UniProtKB/Swiss-Prot annotation:
GO terms for cellular component: cell envelope Sec protein transport complex; cytosol; plasma membrane. Its EC number is 7.4.2.8. GO terms for biological process: intracellular protein transmembrane transport; protein import; protein targeting; protein transport by the Sec complex. It is found in: Cell inner membrane; Cytoplasm. Zn(2+) binds at residues 897, 899, 908-909. SUPFAM superfamilies: Helical scaffold and wing domains of SecA (SSF81886), P-loop containing nucleoside triphosphate hydrolases (SSF52540), Pre-protein crosslinking domain of SecA (SSF81767). Keywords: ATP-binding, Cell inner membrane, Cell membrane, Cytoplasm, Membrane, Metal-binding, Nucleotide-binding, Protein transport, Translocase, Translocation, Transport, Zinc. Monomer and homodimer. Part of the essential Sec protein translocation apparatus which comprises SecA, SecYEG and auxiliary proteins SecDF-YajC and YidC. Belongs to the SecA family. It comes from the Bacteria. The gene is secA. It catalyses: ATP + H2O + cellular proteinSide 1 = ADP + phosphate + cellular proteinSide 2. This is Protein translocase subunit SecA.
Length: 913
């Protein structure tokens, strides 16, 4: 009730923050005259002066006004660009660990230099994060002269970079790279077998460009390093032949079945579900082709892998469409980023879905993979001591940034007021009418020599628009987002008079559309341009620039609404940069995905009430509000999914931290002999307690079992029964001491055969390998647990609590297994003296062999596969990402062993040999 009044009196929180920062801006401005008077050498010397002051205890906050003044003056001298006052506010926002929302064309890259320079003075390193390699190289090379003028070093990390080069890039004061590369290097560092093989320092400060794209859009997408698993391509081919025989079950809204079938498709949650008839039909077909034994159920434990293949095939056929979710190029399935429209070479869907799509398209089916290490961007970026970001559109996601990352969003005032005109949406009955109206709008703009940008949601739509324009004889350029460099060049010239560009979603393009085109690109394309040529190019550009402004600026046409308002705002933001004129219009139809799934009924009834005819459009605020409500509904659902996924991944993340801390401690340790001794004692205590229960009578002791277990785990035969017969005073504790003494004698003999130094090195290598092997299996087990945990909701149990409880038990078993398996390997192995150089060469060969088998996946979560029950036991759809289940009958670590011993598989044939 009083909120509007209080806001009127005191201003919004954002306005109050801007006022606070303006006071600091005045202090920065006061330093300007002093900085102008300095020579280049004196200005550069300021960097060393600041470092010395930090060493004496001065904080970065205290240095900020003077450091910003130095960076601003350096920008003027090196790049001919002076930071505006609002850009100084943006730099302060980044330094304070917040997200700066700045409109297109407000100079985000230049703003970043302020916070980057200030924080690089600490000597702990700054990571600048971009969405693709092209932007990382472009921004690093663009800003390198500024940083080097100030005495700072700049590095760029790229895929397939030589290790020494990458290590040097991370050691630089400022490092540029992509979110993927930073994440993969973090995982690689935690698979290293030597401290010298690691790349990254402590994660200090990161500035994320297009922060919404990385922390929101890709939050559900895990980074996975995997190795190849068994080949099951024949199974995918067989399943692919059966899927087309299944019929979709379709119902009317009232519940009347219009087409009975075998499975249902839910477009909202992107799920497919076999019904009873479908289960029966697919079981019959699988039995016919010999994939399922006669009388067996698809839901038997050993057939769950087959069931996963069936669902993968169904989803490949019914939820993934060519030229929408993926394209086929050079015999490969390339995924298309739904947010940017770019193809994503190298990324693969998990759970066998990618192989199912390859089978559907009759392509060569690539082998499945097993996860070796994984993390999510949500958990990786939360490891930084301080995190900040920049984007043109973050305010709509401010709640999620705060909830997940504790990041506040600060809307930075524009340097010039917005002059763009945003027209109301036009809604048509059919897509055909909508496209016809778009073509008419394009013709009208081109008649006035206005540049036009048409944004589409899919490659399929952009190609359809291109065909329509070709039929009309209208010249245009199409961007299907395959080559970043070419793409940036086309976008740079999309503001020329009469230019028509069709592009998939414009998120993360990183290139401004300048009215009249980009004269700097023209100059760059000339070999050794003369001053006269440059002057002529500038003069020509000035004429074109004025011509476009007089025509009304860039006109942005959107062929449909995206699920996220933020993506729509990014497309709109292409027009009207830095106070330029421009306009935007969204064209919709009731056949669009968003309208059909979420908003069509209300709008359709409204249009019928108006008695609309074919070809007519409705332009009304009520319609726009209905669409925005639908978008908010989708955004809310997607936020719930990401939050739910994070809550589950947080459990794995805590375990990941423990394992990675253990590995780092091992790598840093010179001698782990004490650790191995502790392991030996714990394993022995466990064995003795298992066979000689505390407070038990000698008649209850399983002496034969203890002798066998000691032989299995320690490779030592001990006549325990004989000792007991010979010494009546032997009790549990004294027996344990006698066994330990014998074990130490046997182990010391190994040390004599090699050397203490060689054995210590061998112990470290074995422990690291055991940790990695068991962690890999643990990841698989955790994924499978998460995959089925939603079923606990039907038993009135909280799936999250159940998942936490069971994962804790699994993790405790993992730690016990690490100790036992390490001791077992060290006890059984025969050691010999090895030349240090020979050992180093062998380890290097093994590391290279492992690296050659690794695959780096940033595979989008495969839709909303299994519903996870919420706190009340209802179902919340969640994207589940797990290791693809293979056709071989793989036993879980906690299942009974296949040999019939009655032991768990992990305690029998599942142990490390």
């Amino acid at each position: 009730m009083f909120a509007p009044l209080l806001k009127k009196l005191f201003g919004s929180k954002n306005e109050r923050e801007v006022k606070r920062m303006l006071k600091t801006v005045q202090i920065v401005n006061a330093f300007e005259e002093q900085m102008v008077a300095l020579s280049d050498e004196q200005l550069r010397a300021k960097t060393e002066e600041f470092k010395a002051r930090i060493a004496k205890g001065e904080t970065l906050d205290q240095l900020l006004p003077e450091a910003f003044a130095v960076a601003r003056e350096a920008g003027k001298r090196v790049m001919g660009m002076r930071h505006f006052d609002v850009q100084l506010i943006g730099g302060m926002t980044l330094h304070e660990g917040q997200i700066a929302e700045m409109r297109t064309g407000e100079g985000k890259t230049l703003v970043g230099t302020l916070a980057v320079y200030l924080n690089a003075l600490s000597g702990k390193g700054v990571h600048v994060v971009t969405v693709n390699d092209y932007l990382a190289r472009r921004d690093a090379n663009w800003m390198r002269p500024l940083y080097e003028f100030l005495g700072l070093t700049v590095g760029i990390v790229t895929p397939f970079q030589p290790p020494e080069e990458k290590r040097a890039a991370y050691a630089a004061d400022i490092t540029y790279g992509t979110n993927n590369e930073y994440g993969f290097d973090y995982l690689r560092d935690n698979m290293a077998f030597s401290m010298d093989d690691k790349f990254q320092r402590e994660l200090n400060f990161a500035v994320i460009d297009e922060v919404d794209s990385i922390l929101i859009d890709e939050a559900r997408t895990p980074l996975i390093i995997s190795g190849q698993a068994e080949d099951s391509s024949k199974l995918y081919t067989e399943i692919n032949r059966l899927i087309p025989k299944l019929e979709q079950h379709i119902e009317e809204v009232e519940g009347e079945v219009t087409k009975p079938g075998h499975f249902t498709v839910d477009e909202k949650t992107r799920q497919v579900e076999l019904n009873e008839a479908g289960h029966q039909f697919i079981e019959e077909m699988l039995t016919e082709v010999g994939l399922l034994a006669e009388g067996e159920s698809l839901y038997s434990a050993h057939n769950l892998g087959l069931l996963t293949h069936v669902y993968a095939g169904l989803r490949a056929h019914k939820l993934f469409n060519r030229n929408v979710e993926y394209i086929v190029q050079d015999g490969q399935v390339l995924l298309v980023d739904e947010h940017t429209g770019r193809t994503m070479p190298g990324r693969r869907l998990s759970e066998g879905l990618h192989q199912a799509i390859e089978a559907k398209e009759n392509l060569n089916i690539q082998a499945e993979s097993q996860t070796l290490a994984s993390t999510t961007f949500q958990n990786y970026f939360r490891l930084y001591n301080k995190l900040s970001g920049m984007t043109g559109t973050a305010d709509t996601e401010a709640f999620e940034f705060h909830q997940i990352y504790t990041l506040a969003v600060m809307v930075i005032p524009p340097n010039k007021p917005l002059a763009r005109k945003d027209f109301n949406d036009l809604v048509y009955l059919t897509a055909e009418e909508k496209y016809a109206a778009i073509v008419t709008d394009i013709k009208a703009c081109l008649a006035e020599n206005r540049p036009v940008l048409v944004g589409t949601a899919t490659i399929e739509t952009s190609e359809h628009m291109s065909r329509l324009l070709n039929n009309e004889g209208i010249e245009h350029k199409v961007l299907n987002a395959k080559f970043h460099e070419k793409e940036a060049e086309i976008i740079a010239q999309a503001g020329r008079p009469g230019a028509l560009t069709i592009a998939t979603n414009m998120a993360g393009r990183g290139t401004d559309i300048l009215l009249g085109g980009n004269w700097e690109v023209e100059v760059a394309n000339l070999e050794d341009p003369t001053p006269e040529q440059i002057a002529q190019i500038k003069a020509d550009w000035q004429k074109r620039h004025q011509q476009v402004i007089e025509a009304g600026g860039l006109h942005v046409i959107a062929s449909e609404r995206h699920e996220s308002r933020r993506i729509d705002n990014q497309l709109r933001g292409r027009a009207g940069r830095q106070g330029d004129t421009g306009s935007s219009r969204f064209y919709l139809s009731l056949e669009d995905s968003l309208m059909r799934i979420f908003a069509s009924d209300r709008v359709k009834n409204f249009m019928k009430a108006l008695g609309m005819q074919s070809g007519e459009a409705i332009e009304h605020r009520m319609v726009t509000n209905a669409i925005e409500k639908a978008q908010r509904k989708v955004e809310g659902r997607n936020f719930d999914i990401r939050k739910q996924l994070l809550e589950f991944d947080d459990v794995a993340n805590e375990q990941r931290k423990v394992i990675y801390h253990m590995r780092n401690s091992l790598l840093a340790a010179e001698n782990i002999g004490d650790t191995i001794a502790d392991f030996r004692e714990e394993v022995l205590n466990s064995l003795v307690s298992q066979h000689i229960p505390p407070q038990s009578l000698p008649e209850q002791w399983n002496v034969a079992g203890l002798e066998a277990a000691l032989n299995t785990d320690f490779a030592v035969k001990m006549p325990i029964q004989q000792w007991l017969d010979e010494d009546d005073n032997l009790h549990e504790d004294s027996l344990r001491e006698k066994i330990m003494a014998q074990l130490l004698v046997a182990y010391n003999e190994k040390e004599d055969q090699a050397s203490a130094e060689a054995l210590r090195s061998f112990e470290k290598q074995i422990l690291l390998r055991v940790v990695d092997d068991l962690w890999k299996d643990h990841l698989s087990t955790m994924d499978h647990l998460r995959h089925g945990i939603h079923l606990r909701g039907y038993a009135q149990k909280n799936p999250k609590q159940e998942y936490k409880r069971e994962s804790f038990t699994l993790f405790q078993e993992l730690l016990d297994s690490i100790k036992r398996d390490t001791i077992r390997v060290l006890s059984h192995v025969q050691v010999r003296r090895e030349d240090p150089e020979e050992e180093e060469a062998r380890l290097r060969r093994e590391a290279e062999e492992l690296a050659s088998r690794m695959q780096f996946e940033h595979a989008p979560a495969p839709g909303l596969d299994q519903p996870l029950a919420d706190e009340e036991g209802g179902e919340v759809p969640v994207a589940v990402v797990s290791e693809p289940i293979r056709n071989d009958q793989k036993l879980g670590r906690n299942e009974l062993c296949w040999c019939g011993s009655g032991k768990k598989f992990k305690h029998c044939h599942g142990q490390i040999n």
